[in-house]
Amino acid sequence: VELEQLLERAHSLGEEGNWELMADLLREHLSDFQDEPAVHCWLGVAEHELGLEGVAYERFKRAITLEPEDPYVLATAGNGIAAFDDEDAERVLRTAALTAPGLPLTRLMYGAYLSREGFHEQAQAELDAARALEPEDPQIAYELGVARALGGDIDGAADAVADSVQLDPEDGWARVVFGLLLLEVGRGDEMVGELISGARIRETDVDAQLGAALAAASTRRDEVAYEMLERARLNASEADLVLVADVEDRLDSAEASLQMLSEDLGPDLLRTRLQERP
């Protein structure tokens, strides 16, 4: 099999979400392409999606060691090692953005990295550039919202994430974050609907279910509140059960539900979700 054919097939499987077949395909041919950074990189992507984070990290590191010139590989592998606080991530992502400034992915990944490292102005500049290149990309709009939020502009963050949700209404993660941002800026009526919608999409996301339960209870949508609570309970680990019980104790009171969501669970969820890398 030729390299180009292999990568085309792998990308096709990835677009279908068939990560296991993608990983098997690339592993099968890895010995034939040991010196091809793209093969290691895309195998890392598949293994990351399968939850094999440590193995994926080694694939990304190998891809970088092979000194790729492809900006897609640089941006993807750089983002992959950034999740492990690897000191090479900044250099690799900066190189990708500098060598291919007209490619939205390179500006997106570098901007996403900078925002989580505390370089908010530089991050927004990169993400503004990415959005100018690809204004209809929901991930770019979302990451621009993250950068604004981490930089303290919560209203601007809510506007950007609203655009992301409009571009991709089925992205449950973005909808939950949008709801949490609406809570921060005092747009409570809109917040409830977004948290419930996001939780319905992300059925196994325990924290999203609990946030939606409190939001629903705060407006006396009791049937929805207890539905979300039971979803959370079904998917909860043992460590989650204390929080599930705490939420349940508040659902009988709209005031107590809103207080827990506004002062405790909501800010904590927003903080942790903003730090999640793409």
Where are these regions (language model features)?
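Structural signature of tandem alpha-helical TPR/SEL1-like repeats
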Residues: 16-24, 50-62, 81-95, 117-129, ...
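A conserved position within tetratricopeptide repeats
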Residues: 30-31, 64, 97, 131, ...
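TPR/TPR-like (Sel1-like) alpha-helical repeat modules
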Residues: 200-206, 210, 214-240
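Canonical tetratricopeptide repeat
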Residues: 42, 76-77, 109, 143, ...
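Terminal, low-structured helical/coil segments at or just beyond the last alpha-helical repeat
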Residues: 235-278
